[in-house]
Amino acid sequence: MCRAISLRRLLLLLLQLSQLLAVTQGKTLVLGKEGESAELPCESSQKKITVFTWKFSDQRKILGQHGKGVLIRGGSPSQFDRFDSKKGAWEKGSFPLIINKLKMEDSQTYICELENRKEEVELWVFKVTFSPGTSLLQGQSLTLTLDSNSKVSNPLTECKHKKGKVVSGSKVLSMSNLRVQDSDFWNCTVTLDQKKNWFGMTLSVLGFQSTAITAYKSEGESAEFSFPLNFAEENGWGELMWKAEKDSFFQPWISFSIKNKEVSVQKSTKDLKLQLKETLPLTLKIPQVSLQFAGSGNLTLTLDKGTLHQEVNLVVMKVAQLNNTLTCEVMGPTSPKMRLTLKQENQEARVSEEQKVVQVVAPETGLWQCLLSEGDKVKMDSRIQVLSRGVNQTVFLACVLGGSFGFLGFLGLCILCCVRCRHQQRQAARMSQIKRLLSEKKTCQCPHRMQKSHNLI
């Protein structure tokens, strides 16, 4: 019983395989895209005008030529107005069938009869759908689906951008995380049994003109970030979340809204004193950067069409001389290939390492330069004037002595003012007592009274 069932399944599988092979064996295959035109070939060995007829597989006549070079259609014009032939090619022995405005139901076998023989041509019409469409936001994905006759299996679909990017698949082709640079015309090819058909796709990706922005600044300088869009937008809202290199989490820096192309700040971190331009394109300025601000951020812009994201990076350099050591430090997202170099100007490098901090002990007097570079390209540089150690000590001693003398002078002035003020207070008290005694008329000519008054004065 089991053997009989297995045998039936095997026979059924062989029958299906033979039917599939029969579709293409001895036939010419032509591919066509829905809505476009297809040319089905039919060639004569005599290379001259001869009698020919094109038919459907059910023997219904489509068109033909039975002498005198006149094209005869097999039905009413309304039924066969999409079918035609190239009269100019007849004299060369070519009698193609042209089918315009292809439909999915046109996928079938067509028969060309000429010179007492028949030629079968298999037409496979496919339809291309784009989901969600050919106009998308940056970061979204596009799915290209190829619908075709159920007999068609595993075609190769390949789309190529003019800049060289290639995406390939079979009946389903996916393009994920699209960028603005992916916009423009794509040339696509469908290949089946070594037969090819071409179609074009114009893709429009809406978003920020740059996928990432990195600013390289020395400590104390201002940094400005601009976020231009490749399309006109009037309304939306957004925010910038920032993660400093020393922090382990993101925190909000600024939030804003866009209304009628005007930008308004909703909330901002006070410590940074961020400045946001009131008109598009979005432009953010940090008046004065420092090492503690170095890090990465994510700008989010929410529109009616969807949400856009923009990566923002800030790299900050600081060069300082402390005691007898010259230090150059960089913070922020840098490539592992970047190199930090510390040298005297117009001289060979003293220190050059793939690190974020370099130092020189007992640096020579003169102008020093710190450079952050990647390969031959210098990303940023900063300069500092180094003074000799003796000069530094003299300046320090002068500052200390000057401060000491200044303090002593100030202290003496305070004491003098206090003594003078105390003396004036005592004198005022004595005068007040004399006036009181005089007003009471207790004065007399007695010697002891005169002596008392004199002592009070």
UniProtKB/Swiss-Prot annotation:
InterPro entries reported in the protein's UniProt record: CD4, CD4-extracel, Ig-like_dom, Ig-like_dom_sf, Ig-like_fold, Ig_C2-set, Ig_sub, Ig_V-set
Signal peptide range: 1-26
Lipidation, S-palmitoyl cysteine type: C418, C421
Segments forming domain Ig-like V-type: 27-128
PROSITE patterns recorded: IG_LIKE
Gene3D superfamilies hit by this protein: Immunoglobulins, transmembrane domain of human cd4
Xref: CDD domains: CD4_CD
Phenotypic effect of disruption: Mice lacking Cd4 display markedly decreased T-helper cell activity.
Location of the protein in the cell: Cell membrane
Family matches, as SMART domains: IG, IGv
Membrane disposition: Single-pass type I membrane protein
A GO MF label: protein tyrosine kinase binding
Processing after translation: Palmitoylation and association with LCK contribute to the enrichment of CD4 in lipid rafts.
Pfam families in UniProt: C2-set, CD4-extracel, ig, Tcell_CD4_C
Keywords carried by this UniProt record: Adaptive immunity, Cell membrane, Disulfide bond, Glycoprotein, Immunity, Immunoglobulin domain, Lipoprotein, Membrane, Palmitate, Phosphoprotein, Repeat, Signal, Transmembrane, Transmembrane helix
SUPFAM superfamilies: Immunoglobulin
Tissue-level expression: Highly expressed in T-helper cells. The presence of CD4 is a hallmark of T-helper cells which are specialized in the activation and growth of cytotoxic T-cells, regulation of B cells, or activation of phagocytes. CD4 is also present in other immune cells such as macrophages, dendritic cells or NK cells.
Extracellular side stretches: 27-394
Residues recorded with modification Phosphoserine: S432, S439
Any one of the GO BP annotations: positive regulation of canonical NF-kappaB signal transduction
Chief localization: membrane
The record's note on its domains: The Ig-like V-type domain mediates the interaction with MHCII.
Subunit record text: Forms disulfide-linked homodimers at the cell surface. Interacts with LCK. Interacts with PTK2/FAK1. Binds to P4HB/PDI. Interacts with IL16; this interaction induces a CD4-dependent signaling in lymphocytes. Interacts (via Ig-like V-type domain) with MHCII alpha chain (via alpha-2 domain) and beta chain (via beta-2 domain); this interaction increases the affinity of TCR for peptide-MHCII. CD4 oligomerization via Ig-like C2-type 2 and 3 domains appears to be required for stable binding to MHCII and adhesion between T cells and APCs.
Full protein name: T-cell surface glycoprotein CD4
Protein's organism: Mus musculus
Gene it is expressed from: Cd4
